[in-house]
Curated annotation (Swiss-Prot):
The active site is at H9 (proton acceptor). It catalyses: Co-sirohydrochlorin + 2 H(+) = sirohydrochlorin + Co(2+). Substrate binds at Q43, F68, A69, A70, G71, T72, H73. SUPFAM superfamilies: Chelatase. PANTHER family: SIROHYDROCHLORIN FERROCHELATASE, CHLOROPLASTIC. It comes from Sulfurisphaera tokodaii (strain DSM 16993 / JCM 10545 / NBRC 100140 / 7). This is Sirohydrochlorin cobaltochelatase. Keywords: Cobalamin biosynthesis, Cobalt, Lyase, Metal-binding. It is an enzyme of class 4 (lyase). The lineage of its organism: Archaea, Thermoproteota, Thermoprotei, Sulfolobales, Sulfolobaceae. Belongs to the CbiX family. CbiXS subfamily.
Amino acid sequence: MYGVLLVLHGSKIKEWQDVAIQYANLLRKYFDLVEYGFIEFNQPSITEAAKKLASNGVDTIIVVPLLFAAGTHFKRDIPKQLEEIKGVKIMIAEPIGVDERIAEILKERVEEVLRSSTRS
């Protein structure tokens, strides 16, 4: 059995917690066991979230970073925070990267701004 661990950067701004909850809830439409963890600033940490999945009986944790690029957090910090998780296979998905679907969302945001500016 596997669980999904959504990893977010985190921020001193409280709204990051809300974003994490909303994304985790969206993923729960597709996967039974989903938790979220933050690289820094917010709780739960990546380690805490992984331990919660492990305590629910998963034997594999699929880590999904909500990051755009494979920088230091992806290459160093995420694996380091998962080191103490024993007895569970850890698989880390690639960051979002450059993706046409993201470009579509960005295009929509530009169009929204243009529409709203013509109304003012």
